[in-house]
Amino acid sequence: MQEQKSLKVNSILNILKTISAIVFPLITFPYVSRVLQPENIGKVNFSGTYVGYFSLIASLGIATYAVRECAAVRDDRKNLSSVASEIFSINVCTTALAYILLAVSLVLFRRLDNYRTLIYIQSTTILFATWGADWINSAMEDFKYITIRSILFQCVSLILTFVLIKSPDDYLNYAIISVFSSSGANLSNVFYRRKYCNLRVTINMQVQKHFKPILLLFVMILAQTIFNSADITMLGLFCGDTEVGIYSTAYRIKSIIVQVVSSLAVVMMPRMSYYFAENDWDKINDMLKKVLSVMVTIGFPCIAGGVSLSDDIVRLVGGIEYADASMPLKILMLSFIIDIFGGNFLGNMICLPTKQEKVFMEACCVAAGVNVILNYLLIPVGGASAAAFTSGVAALVIFIWLLLKKDKRVRLDYILDVIKMPMVGAVAIVLFCSAIKVFKFGFWMSLVMKIGGSVVLYGSLQLGVRNPVVWDMLDLILKKIGRKGESR
């Protein structure tokens, strides 16, 4: 019973954290994108992407591995302190290596001189991430602290954004605020983590024990990062900062929706890992069906809305200067259909809980190679839209690879039954939004009618076709309301 309660509480907390991560960018990015203009937004995003490669070297696969290993010994403070210190010390060494390689790259590649200050600023995220060791909180399932801390720092960053960003020349301030928002919270971990363990740097790092699984996870994450970041990097090299700014705007909008769907894996993965360890395949397949049902019930209407409202969303978020981001956004949203079934479902919900990182790694490596080759061929011709298309191809490669390599005991015969109800609702959203366009309403009236009408239409259809996910959510809401009424 306690296990179920913990899962529900963690789910609610993670939803709150995800919503805050969505709401704050929706508030700040329209303002920032208009003030800084596409060129300066492109500079910040390009340098951030570049630093991201070295951040990956520093982190390896340590965070994912550390959560798994520390969670296994979390009831023994002494053992937890020992394991955490070993992993932390390895992380310190990889961080030092990352900074050395970053310094060498700045000397070798003179084209980066224009981005040097931005790179200095954004590279501090590497230090903060290592120093903070936030994986301890995740291993202890302290989602309450993680959620409150994240929202607090986002609130402060929101205020700083409107105070310190007033002109296009303030793009350095934007970079500093972004670092503070994403990594500043790690500073509080230095004191808070003492609640769980005594973390220190040790010479006895047990490298032979830890390094092989860390390296395997690193290769997987590296491949994921390449096909996620190669688009922006190669756009910057072939097409310039403006095209990067346009693509980044579309990609950021898509990322907001991805966060909502992907957040489910954060809470469900421990439960899936438990069932896999118990080899209870009846519960495994039942849980997988429920997880996929939630993913498509939430994801499909978001995708339909993103495609139908792409022009409106881009205008709302970035302004008319970013109008060219509409087509890349449409392509990215359509490719997310593939990603739901591939990386999110087959990868995060099946491969990782079963410790099949090698299969996931192989899929990501092949996809990364395909993505880079296609980017080289298509970006000089098609720009941001070509970059969006290659991302979709990479997602398709991952899906096909994981589907062919999946455990034969994993049943997928329920997929058509699961997707048919959300698919009906998604098609209805597209048709409804297309009909609204015919009447030529003003921008705000049209936007409100499209969003409001789509929500009502989709919800009504899902209730009408008896979608169990929607009915369970409605039942939960009614029970909460009933309890509040009884307490009064």
Where are these regions (language model features)?
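Interfacial segments at transmembrane-helix termini and the short loops linking adjacent helices
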Residues: 4, 106-122, 307-339
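Helix-loop junctions and terminal segments of transmembrane helices
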Residues: 29-30, 59-75, 250, 254-292, ...
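Signature of the first transmembrane helix
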Residues: 5-64, 99, 103-106, 157-158, ...
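Hydrophobic alpha-helical transmembrane segments
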Residues: 116, 120-123, 147-195, 213, ...
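Membrane-interface junctions at transmembrane-helix termini in multi-pass inner-membrane proteins
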Residues: 116, 127-148, 334-366, 377
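Interhelical loop/hinge segments that connect adjacent transmembrane helices in multipass membrane
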Residues: 1-3, 7, 144-147, 171-178, ...
